Amino acid sequence: MAAEQDPEARAAARPLLTDLYQATMALGYWRAGRARDAAEFELFFRRCPFGGAFALAAGLRDCVRFLRAFRLRDADVQFLASVLPPDTDPAFFEHLRALDCSEVTVRALPEGSLAFPGVPLLQVSGPLLVVQLLETPLLCLVSYASLVATNAARLRLIAGPEKRLLEMGLRRAQGPDGGLTASTYSYLGGFDSSSNVLAGQLRGVPVAGTLAHSFVTSFSGSEVPPDPMLAPAAGEGPGVDLAAKAQVWLEQVCAHLGLGVQEPHPGERAAFVAYALAFPRAFQGLLDTYSVWRSGLPNFLAVALALGELGYRAVGVRLDSGDLLQQAQEIRKVFRAAAAQFQVPWLESVLIVVSNNIDEEALARLAQEGSEVNVIGIGTSVVTCPQQPSLGGVYKLVAVGGQPRMKLTEDPEKQTLPGSKAAFRLLGSDGSPLMDMLQLAEEPVPQAGQELRVWPPGAQEPCTVRPAQVEPLLRLCLQQGQLCEPLPSLAESRALAQLSLSRLSPEHRRLRSPAQYQVVLSERLQALVNSLCAGQSP
């Protein structure tokens, strides 16, 4: 399979984004004559993140891009030669130069699907040496993407469907790649937009942003714009000096608010006028550079009303400090009173945007009934996942040469499930998930209405379940290196995530002390586990 041009260049994973022991194992396999043994690995996690009962599968598109472009360049091989033993057979490095993923097959949970412990997010099969080399980069691509998508989904559940969520954590992210990944998968998880321009260009994430305090403080009030005139929104009639018009309105606003006309900061007003001249149809004011009540709010109202006289409507205001909930409620009261006073009904519904180190607890307060907040900007708490910085994904060998393999350990949680498997979601009559079931790939596909004997984790006896619907979970994504079907767009995966979460029961969806979702084994898979634990051959 020829290497494909990577449209995102350095933003993508590369073959040497890996741990050295993958290369040392590759040499060991090659030296043992096992490089081309047929093998299968599964990528999964053992516990749902953040103490919850669900995760979202993400990162598949990045994995596909990586696999289709996988080739070791001469420089890669030369570097490996420099860190492997100097007496390594040169034929091994020639073997590396010829590697690609043309014999690799991948089955996967679609991006945006609900994922649960032990259920593979990816099944990767192909020559042993190649699929071993894929372990670290695939974990890197899937684990953080799934973690941040799940984190974003939790924040969306707290915010509810009406609040707009803006991801604005690029400057807080763990490096450029972390920032791009966070912006991409916070959108998949339910955020509405991102401040990250590169995520918009490369991934199609809707972008949003206005102005910072530096823009406001850069103005003193003495500046004269080169063209202070603004034409009416309808395009007819002479232009108007917006700064002069805002000054006229300021006197009326200050009288209405009981302020002296000298109290609002002139530099802040000049900044608002400059921004309004640049964005007359998208004017927003940042209110808390000096004083929300004595400066930011009256200056915003003066400029907004001047724009309104020309047929434009201000979009919103932003708060970045203080008691955000209380300020938003008070600002909304001012907007309603000003709308009535100046007979501009649209002013009542101007958006109120808030930001300032918002975490789950603060978000719950801002989302409560009676909050007047419309848009919530979240940075650090979404991109860094402070409650749990790692998903804990693993990539484990389950079969070699068609024979099952199992990791046996004294820690039952770290035992792996052997063999090539199929995964199914068992659904109730209302379409809500009841449990996921893993079975051996060669077993018959379970049918809706069929009574199934299954083994819950750690159970001493099987139980029975009769699903109303059965949903296969793993889709054939790559077969012998070829894409089997077009991947969904990011927006489509986002829609799937929202639909999947809406179908999950409230007991499993709640964020504190949720009911744990069961992943069960078929009788044949449980029997295989028991035989291998007893030291018997499969």
From Swiss-Prot:
Nicotinate binds at residues 21, 210, 318. Transiently phosphorylated on a His residue during the reaction cycle. Phosphorylation strongly increases the affinity for substrates and increases the rate of nicotinate D-ribonucleotide production. Dephosphorylation regenerates the low-affinity form of the enzyme, leading to product release. Changing residue 21 to A: Partial loss of activity in the presence of ATP, complete loss in the absence of ATP. Changing residue 357 to A: Small loss of activity. It comes from the Eukaryota. Changing residue 213 to A: Partial loss of activity. Its EC number is 6.3.4.21. GO terms for molecular function: metal ion binding; nicotinate phosphoribosyltransferase activity; transferase activity. One of its GO terms (biological process) is NAD biosynthetic process via the salvage pathway. 5-phospho-alpha-D-ribose 1-diphosphate binds at residue 380. Homodimer. NCBIfam families: NAPRTase_put. The gene is NAPRT. Belongs to the NAPRTase family. This is Nicotinate phosphoribosyltransferase. The keyword Metal-binding applies. The modification Phosphoserine is found at residue 537. InterPro entries: Aldolase_TIM (IPR013785), NAPRTase_C (IPR041619), NAPRTase_N (IPR040727), Nic_PRibTrfase-Fam (IPR007229), Nic_PRibTrfase_pncB (IPR006405), Nicotinate_pribotase-like_C (IPR036068). The keyword Isomerase does not apply.
